[in-house]
């Protein structure tokens, strides 16, 4: 259902508030440069620092500005099952095409707890749902066997797999790739994951290089493996630079250097350190981004 280059959109702030005008411009910039879908209010969108009204407003603005041109997969995950259901219901009412549901963080549920959490959301809200497995941020890895159980539910249509493990991604696709889509959650292994059967990527890099990420995915679907491989290798340095410090600090800094938004972050995220900034600038200059 969801395929191609889907941007994990940063949330622009100015003077402590969501910068709505810039957010609208960023949506247009993505679509004009070939992005196939937009996912606001995820990790890269600093969703954990948004209050409920801000969270819903960001989703609403993105849906309005997209205006049906590409799918919108709204981040509505929470470590509270009840809250995730509420956010997902509201996103559906606003017109989201799907929701992105991160595994519950901090409370470290068992595999059975993960299953019951996602099953409860799927039972409560009739909207296409993308599971989001990112154990480096949540503290728990959702195993392929658990995903396979969840894949039996009609509302669960995909998983954003961000373990960085090709072995786990391959096991996912072997176990349930015929029932749900597997989407790369790591820019640096998009091409290898697609070679194993992934349908695309939910990308951090696409915030600053949307055309190139979209072209990589398009080349793969066109059967031009040489071009897809070339783009994969050419993007490795910028992909790595996006994670020299905690995401989304590097990508928001990069976007600010390109004039796409202000550099403003919300605590507890802090500005990029001086050494990391120098590294980021050098990498961006090598790509002609600044």
From Swiss-Prot:
It comes from the Bacteria. The active site is at residues 132, 160. Pathway: Amino-acid biosynthesis; L-lysine biosynthesis via DAP pathway; (S)-tetrahydrodipicolinate from L-aspartate: step 3/4. Pyruvate binds at residues 44, 202. GO terms for cellular component: cytosol. Keywords: Amino-acid biosynthesis, Cytoplasm, Diaminopimelate biosynthesis, Lyase, Lysine biosynthesis, Schiff base. The record marks 43, 106 as: Part of a proton relay during catalysis. It catalyses: L-aspartate 4-semialdehyde + pyruvate = (2S,4S)-4-hydroxy-2,3,4,5-tetrahydrodipicolinate + H2O + H(+). Transmembrane segments: none annotated. It is found in: Cytoplasm. GO terms for molecular function: 4-hydroxy-tetrahydrodipicolinate synthase activity. Pfam families: DHDPS. GO terms for biological process: diaminopimelate biosynthetic process; lysine biosynthetic process via diaminopimelate. Its EC number is 4.3.3.7. Belongs to the DapA family. NCBIfam families: dapA. HAMAP family: DapA. This is 4-hydroxy-tetrahydrodipicolinate synthase. The lineage of its organism: Bacteria, Pseudomonadati, Thermodesulfobacteriota, Desulfuromonadia, Desulfuromonadales. The gene is dapA.
């Amino acid at each position: 259902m969801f395929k191609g280059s889907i941007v994990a959109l940063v949330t622009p702030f100015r003077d402590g508030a969501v910068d709505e005008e810039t957010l609208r411009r960023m949506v247009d910039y993505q679509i004009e440069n070939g992005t196939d879908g937009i996912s606001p209010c995820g990790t890269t969108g600093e969703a954990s620092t948004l209050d409920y009204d801000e969270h819903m407003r960001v989703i609403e603005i993105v849906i309005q500005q997209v205006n049906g041109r590409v799918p919108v997969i709204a981040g509505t995950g929470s470590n509270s099952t009840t809250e995730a259901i509420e956010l997902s219901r509201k996103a559906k009412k606003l017109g989201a095409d799907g929701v992105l549901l991160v595994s519950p963080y901090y409370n470290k549920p068992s595999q059975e707890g993960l299953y019951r959490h996602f099953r409860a959301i799927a039972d409560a809200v009739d909207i296409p749902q993308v599971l989001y497995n990112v154990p480096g941020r949540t503290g728990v890895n959702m195993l392929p066997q658990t995903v396979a159980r969840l894949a039996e539910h009609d509302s669960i249509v995909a998983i954003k797999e961000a373990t960085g493990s090709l072995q786990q991604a391959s096991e996912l696709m072997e176990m349930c790739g015929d029932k749900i889509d597997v989407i790369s959650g790591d820019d640096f292994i998009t091409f290898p994951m697609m070679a194993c059967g992934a349908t695309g990527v939910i990308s951090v890099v696409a915030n600053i290089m949307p055309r190139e990420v979209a072209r990589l995915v398009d080349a793969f679907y066109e059967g031009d493996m040489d071009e897809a491989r070339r783009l994969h290798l050419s993007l490795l340095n910028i992909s790595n630079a996006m994670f020299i410090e905690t995401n989304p600090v590097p990508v928001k800094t990069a976007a600010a250097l390109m004039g796409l938004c202000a550099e403003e972050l919300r605590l507890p995220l802090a500005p990029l350190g001086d050494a990391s900034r120098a590294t980021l600038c050098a990498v961006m200059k090598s790509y002609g981004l600044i």
